[in-house]
Amino acid sequence: MSRPLILVTNDDGYSSKGIEILNNVASNFGDTIIVAPNSEKSGKAHGITLYDPIGLKKIDNQNQLIYSVDGTPVDCVKIAINSLLDKKPKLILSGINHGLNVGRSILYSGTVSAASESIMIGIPSIAFSLQKSEEMDFTNVDIILEKLIKNALDEDFPNDVVWNVNIPKTVNEKINGIKLTKQGKSNFNEIYHKRKDPRNNTYFWVDGAIESIEEDLDVDEVAIRNGYVSITPLSFELTSQKYLENNQSKGFFDFEK
Amino acid sequence: MSRPLILVTNDDGYSSKGIEILNNVASNFGDTIIVAPNSEKSGKAHGITLYDPIGLKKIDNQNQLIYSVDGTPVDCVKIAINSLLDKKPKLILSGINHGLNVGRSILYSGTVSAASESIMIGIPSIAFSLQKSEEMDFTNVDIILEKLIKNALDEDFPNDVVWNVNIPKTVNEKINGIKLTKQGKSNFNEIYHKRKDPRNNTYFWVDGAIESIEEDLDVDEVAIRNGYVSITPLSFELTSQKYLENNQSKGFFDFEK
């Protein structure tokens, strides 16, 4: 039996530690190709590059096919599928992000967006993130990844939801298990530092931290805090069915000019 | 009674025709402030600027308070709320985008993302887009905007869904009405043009067009094609409830290391 093709990407750049570990584990299950940004692209969300040329470089590496893209994580998936791969990959893996992607800040995440782009073209996908610590410690992360990637290669793995996987930093010592969770409402609480440049122009630096407002153990961020690996199934069909049902019959929408 | 504060933004830049018309109509209902990108930021999605300083300029204009931000549409909303406004606006309006934001390509849209950022902080929001034509013709668009903005200032207007409003280019002659719609599955069908620079480095330009695969009149893109203004209520709570219900009891998630 031929080995499945697995596309590996991220938003921290092709040379990050996280993508190296993800690719090492994925290589146990299939033929991998890395197509990832040339540098840190955190916060790029589902952005695409429309008005600039997108540079592509093949990285010199004897053991692994790696392409570096001067663009966003979503650009990487699109260019891989449209121009680099001979066949459709069986699975697209994104990460391992250096830092959590939980709560509302998921919307800003390039790691998750590479995965949502994948399911939009019908390819199953997982986004992996490891909780930040002073020195990112990836000990034991491979054990979690092995279990999840093996499962994702099963025929019944969904291609219409993204598995958003977040791993607590305690994984280097122990974890309490894996939890299927909901996206929480916790948000990134920004502080904008206002400064002046030498020519007296105003500019800002953004800073801040996740504001924890959740308590239920089935919420992504709370599961992590309690030492669980969190898996949130995300759908990108955005229509609010509830709003449609409650408002469909309102006269307002029958307006004729 | 004091007039409500309305924040106006977009992704085409503060000097675009679309935002001027949107702001003109909004001014009939409240005190407006424009905080918008300094240039075209289409395709920036929900991106935020994490690793660069974000420049801010007050634009010299006697009749209207305008700030220009060297950042994404979401940066504009965040900086306005965090640093520029004395009080929370009653409503945040985004657009009018020069071109539709329908189907799956909503995910790439800076116009829609400024609106989704707004509901994440609990402020009602509408994203407006006008179908592209060779010369963007905004005739009669103000009539539609007036009706929708007036409605959005009602106390019962939702602050947990975005109204994604798309207006057909036929509005300059006639429209057939307003339809409450669903987000379609039509996607942007990209073509990547591969080129070489003078130093033999590979780069790509992206090009393409919306691929229409929908037929039901209650789908955003089909409503537009049939001469209706399309209003899709969008929610950004991404958890797939369906997946949770179907998989919650699976042993897989009880894994103990």
Question: Which residues are covered by each model-predicted region?
Answer:
Chain A
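Hydrophobic/aromatic ligand-binding patch that stacks against planar heteroaromatic rings
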Residues: 114-118
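C-terminal accessory domains and tails appended to enzymatic cores
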Residues: 158, 162-164, 168-257
